[in-house]
């Protein structure tokens, strides 16, 4: 009887959110993102790729709404800004045909998943011809925590084959703000077009003095990002963002 009541509760909660449209979910996550007016944070990024090693990269990041970003680092290497600091609304604009997932295996009542078709132009991929463009159709599953209105997982795949999975882990920081404390990006790439794009992205983090000569079209690895020493909504001078 207890399990039946629990099942009915989960079903009712899921139906309540499903009665909303995807735009409602996106707006709620975007509103939550914009409640953070500014912050600074220390970030450590490590990359693990088979047969390749590199030291951890440390960054200090300053962010101020709506789109001011300043990244400081020692030595070579740049932190890709797209995706990490852009709003959910902007990130969702890289998807088309956004709808609710039909996957009914989830049991967390504070969770919902959206599915969208990835807009290839957002990847800056070199697609050789129109036929390749028509047959190359990645989809993206976005898992949203509907209690805190944050994105916890982004899974990119072609058919049922995973090519990239991002997981975000959150906690309360600086007394009262729910922010990511760790993110992981796992690659499972067998497609030459995507491997070249990912090689370029990883090379950017490492710095231009590093050459990503991975001989295979296969890129399989893990990028880990740890966040620490948050200072949230304490104000940041505009001069910080001047070059």
What is the role of each PLM region?
Residues 8, 38, 68, 111-113, ...:
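A residue-level signal for beta-strand positions that form part of recognition/binding surfaces
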Residues 13, 17-18, 82-99, 154-164:
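Short, charged, low-hydrophobicity "junction" segments
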Residues 35, 63-65, 148:
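Short loop/turn positions at the edges of beta-strands in beta-sheet-rich folds
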Residues 109-239:
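Gly/Pro-enriched, hydrophobic low-complexity segments
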Residues 48-117:
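An acidic-aromatic
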Residues 8-51, 102-105, 242:
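N-terminal leader/targeting segments and the immediate start of mature chains
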Residues 41-43, 54-60, 66, 71-73, ...:
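Extended beta-sheet lipid-handling architectures
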Residues 1-8:
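Sec-dependent signal peptide recognition
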